[in-house]
Amino acid sequence: MAIKKRNKIRLPSGSPEEVGIDGSAHKPMQQIKPLVSNDSEDDDNDICVLQPIKFKKVPKRDITFDGEQAIKEDNSHYEDLYHSKKNTNASTRNKDDLLILNMEDLMEGNHHLLSDSSEAGSSSEGEHISSIPTRGEIAKLKAQKSLSRRKISESDVTTERDYVKLLDSEDKREIMETIRLNGGLKRNNEKEITNFSDDEMQGFQDEMLALTDNQIAIQKDSKRKIIEKAINEVPYRTNEEWETQLLSKGNINKSNEKIITPLPVLFPDDDESGNSIERINEMVSKICLQRKKVEMRLQALEKTKIDLEKSKASLINKLIGN
């Protein structure tokens, strides 16, 4: 890095008044000569070379408080956690020391391989081989398996529990997923539907979704007609004779119910004239009383009919709303 000097500008030494009197301000300014030379030798001498920074190692100081002594940490217990390279090299085994055993070979009389390998191996290898089952243990395991197979064969019926015991967690998860997609588990109170054809399902298909107000009104009217048709088809009006008999009493059911037939003129005798009039009056009063009773019953029936029609309309509206 070359450092160059700046050019200095020399100002006139005289006062500004003298400069104005002498008229030096009107003189042309001379060019200022540079004071620094452009020689390459001077530039090389002016280059400053930065020295590398060096840091000194300072020992770590242990900070101790008043009345306390510095305690050195014992890191010996960490050595047990990490094995050295010497220990790892000693623990490694050669590929020739490994021995592959077959259960059938052991049963056929090749058990002498175990003894040879145990004699040739180290103490650690001997511990590993000692965990291999003996001939008696192998025979015992085979006997237990044969007993379990015999129990299954005696039943001749494989239950779902026996099948599930052979499955792992992934198979069980897949089975539960397929059950969930097919409608879930079947309850005991559900009825079994067999031979259910597609033609029978046509009545249960969903209708087109009504989006506009006009479509909603048309759908409600169609539902109302279907419900009213189903209600009218119910044969609950089987015993209507009592109603006709009730209306026929007192000439209420006839067209000329307000017209009373005139009675014939009787020629009363001297003795029986009073008794006959009283009988006629009693009969007329009984008929009028009976007629009033029938009219009251008819009014009550009409009132109940109106209430039933109102409840029917409200029930239809609820069914359409749902």
From Swiss-Prot:
Note: Present with 892 molecules/cell in log phase SD medium.
Species this chain originates from: Saccharomyces cerevisiae (strain ATCC 204508 / S288c)
Main location: cytoplasm
Pfam families, sorted: NTR2 (PF15458)
Chain's gene name: NTR2
Claim: DNA damage is one of the keywords in the record: no
Keyword Repeat: no
InterPro entries: Ntr2 (IPR028211)
Compartments reported by the entry: Cytoplasm; Nucleus
Region (Disordered): 1-30, 113-137
Example GO BP: spliceosomal complex disassembly
Name of the protein described by the UniProt record: Pre-mRNA-splicing factor NTR2
Key words of the record: Cytoplasm, mRNA processing, mRNA splicing, Nucleus, Phosphoprotein, Spliceosome
GO cellular component: cytoplasm; endoplasmic reticulum; nucleus; spliceosomal complex; U2-type post-mRNA release spliceosomal complex
Phosphoserine: residues bearing it: 40, 153, 197
Function: Involved in pre-mRNA splicing and spliceosome disassembly. Promotes release of excised lariat intron from the spliceosome by acting as a receptor for PRP43. This targeting of PRP43 leads to disassembly of the spliceosome with the separation of the U2, U5, U6 snRNPs and the NTC complex.
Low complexity biased stretches: 115-132
Subunit-level organization: Component of the NTR complex (NTC-related complex), composed of NTR1, NTR2 and PRP43. Interacts with CLF1, NTR1 and PRP43.
